Amino acid sequence: MVDRNLLHYIVVTGILIKNGKFLIVKRADWEKAFPGKWTLPGGKLEVLDYVLRQKDTSDHWYNVFEDLLKREILEEVGLEIKGGNFDYVASMVYIRPDKIPCLIVNLSIEIPDDEQNVRLCPALTDFAWADLEEAKNHDLIEGIYEELEILDKKLKTGKVLEWGK
């Protein structure tokens, strides 16, 4: 029997940075969690995200978060992430309205200023490339603004900070 105390969804979100601005997206009003709020692209890890792939060692799959985030970014906002290194920003746990706990890991990546255009999936209704000041004008899910602050300070000073209000 599985111990429900040990079960969590694992969610990876991404802060995409282009020309010093962050990509934020608005959730559809019909979404179960945080309807109509502004957030970051990302999604849940599923077993099929790795088990159909060849293992990287005899026992393990590597880069699972990175591969998941690349797929979710392509599905949700139509941007293809080619190569690149994701950086860790923050992690948190959230209990959804349906009582399922979610471990959320937030990563960031700078993307080139190329010809790719954002194309939203049906679960998202709007997007913005926003700097910190512009992000204040959007109804962000609580805590996301602080994640953007952490990343902004890291980009400007090289200092890595922990999340805090």
Regions found by a protein language model. Name each.
Residues K18:
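A cytosolic small-molecule/anion-sensing beta-strand core signal
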Residues S108, V118-E149:
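NUDIX/MutT-family hydrolases
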Residues Y145-K165:
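Charged phosphate-binding loop/patch that engages nucleotide di/tri-phosphates or the phosphate backbone
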Residues M1-T13, W30-E31:
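Acidic, metal-coordinating catalytic segment for phosphate/diphosphate chemistry
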Residues T13, K21, D126:
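Conserved beta-strand and immediately adjacent loop positions that scaffold enzyme active sites
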Residues V77-G84:
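Short secondary-structure junctions
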Residues G84, A90-N117, L151-K154:
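Active-site-adjacent beta-strand/loop module that shapes the phosphate/pyrophosphate-binding cleft
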Residues K21-E75:
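Conserved Nudix-box catalytic region and its N-terminal flanking loop in Nudix hydrolases
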